[in-house]
Amino acid sequence: MDDQNKNLILATALSFIVILVWFVLFPPPEPEMPLTGETSTELTPDAATGSLPSVTSDTAPSVVIEGETRSAALEQAPRVEIATDRVKGSISLLGGRIDDLSLKDYRETQEEDADIVTMLSPVGSPGAYYALYGWAAGAGVDPSQVPGPDTEWQVIDGDILSVDAPVTLQWDNGAGLSFTRIIEIDDNYMFQITQSVANTSDAPVTVAPYGILARHGEPDDLKNFFILHEGVVAMADGELTETNWDDIPEFPVDQREGVPAERIENVLNGWIGFTDHFWMSVLIPDPSASARLTTKYRPRADIYQAETVLPAQTVAPGTSVSATTQLFAGAKEWETIRNYQTDGVDRFIDSIDWGWFFFLTKPIFFLLHYLNAFIGNMGWAIIGLTLIIKAILLPLAYKSYVSMAKMKELQPQMEKLKEEAGDDRQKMQQGMMELYKKEKVNPAAGCLPILLQIPIFFSLYKVIFVTIELRHAPFFGPFQDLSAPDPTSIMNLYGLLPFDGPEPGSIMALIFIGILPLLLGISMWLQQKLNPAPTDPTQQMIFAWMPWVFMFMLGGFASGLVVYWIANNTITFVQQYMIMRSQGYKPDVFGNIKGGFQKKTKPDSK
């Protein structure tokens, strides 16, 4: 039955290999790009007076020079500067769009002179991405009487938008309506936009405040990896909705919008926006107002839109109304987003893609975050996390290793039963079960620690892949990005030879592995040497190859994950050795290593 126990462990390990190979070899297919081109529509009121008007406007100005550089596009309109400790950019006075934003704390690569990350870009530049606010015309109101994408706003207060220094814009339609927009920003990534309209005419008007996030085409840096959500994310009445980029054009055509769209009506305390790997933009309407959240795709213009529209308001002569909306545009930092959730943004922490194992990924990241804050190094934080996980699982591991030690003690009796049963496998199995029952041994107990490690491994992989705190997180020496594969390579003797190794992620990098995968293979191999090699030749060969197969297979994974696996193997080795010795079984590690290198002689036939 010892062979059966090894078969159980082997089956689990091979299943694990299949799952990991699937991650590497079978990412989701690339989506087809939709047709491109520009079109122009305008704000049109809903047929029902007093209901939410449709927002079907072209978010771009009527005159756009496509394909120009970002710097050239920024020069097409007067601007108000945005400057804080964490972001820089500008607001276009043409349309009042927030369309120029970069994140000072993040660079595109780890090079010291690398460009900082660009979050929002103006119309006309590659990958235009911006936020637009305004008032949708209600029943009886001419759309030309409300501000649109071609509206030229005037600055009436504030030269530079910064923390505690808002900017106020104004536009008068010349027909008795004056529109004012106050834009504020905090010390992180949250804008607050307060829109108001004053009616000095002789007749009441009905308008509805809206906010639009527009992206021209899909992002160029899509990961297209099924463990990561990229696309639209929305929260409506406590329910999170995620829509992938390639699913948005497949929406049914909305009769009022005339384009593929999906609406969520009468939402309280909701939000909607676009999420990327590490960055996100989200519209957050007044939580006390009943809002409509819309995801929309304009196929001819190839523009994706996320919209919020608040209920229409009637502005009587001589009065004014206002509405406040927030805009988050920045990095998906756990602590920053958690603070916004504490301030009232419902379930904002779930904008980070925690995955199916959220009940594991959330606490794992929580521990990593605070271990890193305490230690000051994410690599050592991963090792500390491994120690904590192994300590939590120690009671189960103890029972497993005790059972394995007892199995070793029963080996002579098991061999005797095999000899007595001969070819009668049923008799042998019955005898084995009686022996296990008598000695109170569970032959499958050795599988339990391995089974428990599988969801933990996947959860940590998810955390390392999706959280920005692991992006460019250094360990030591050459390991300056724990979210990237090991940059070292045996090709240049790990930096001793005067040339670079293969590009990380390439086929050559999988062959000429780095230091960390090598240590992983060695740690797995040593862990096996706690027990004698299986007597079955097939099992013996599979067990002999397994550490080195894992070594090459995991060589292309994030180095932080490999650090976890090395630490896990090392701690498991120590735990198993000490527990088995405490039960009277003394693992002969050096003897098993020596035996593994000895040439096996074929037994004499009888």
Curated annotation (Swiss-Prot):
Its main location: membrane. One of its GO terms (biological process) is protein insertion into membrane. The keyword Transport applies. Keywords: Cell inner membrane, Cell membrane, Chaperone, Membrane, Protein transport, Transmembrane, Transmembrane helix, Transport. It is a multi-pass membrane protein. Disulfide bonds: none annotated. It is found in: Cell inner membrane. InterPro entries: Membr_insert_YidC (IPR019998), Membr_insert_YidC_N (IPR028053), YidC/ALB3/OXA1/COX18 (IPR001708), YidC/Oxa/ALB_C (IPR028055), YidC_ALB_C (IPR047196), YidC_periplasmic_sf (IPR038221). NCBIfam families: PRK01318.1-4, yidC_nterm, yidC_oxa1_cterm. Interacts with the Sec translocase complex via SecD. Specifically interacts with transmembrane segments of nascent integral membrane proteins during membrane integration. Belongs to the OXA1/ALB3/YidC family. Type 1 subfamily. This is Membrane protein insertase YidC.
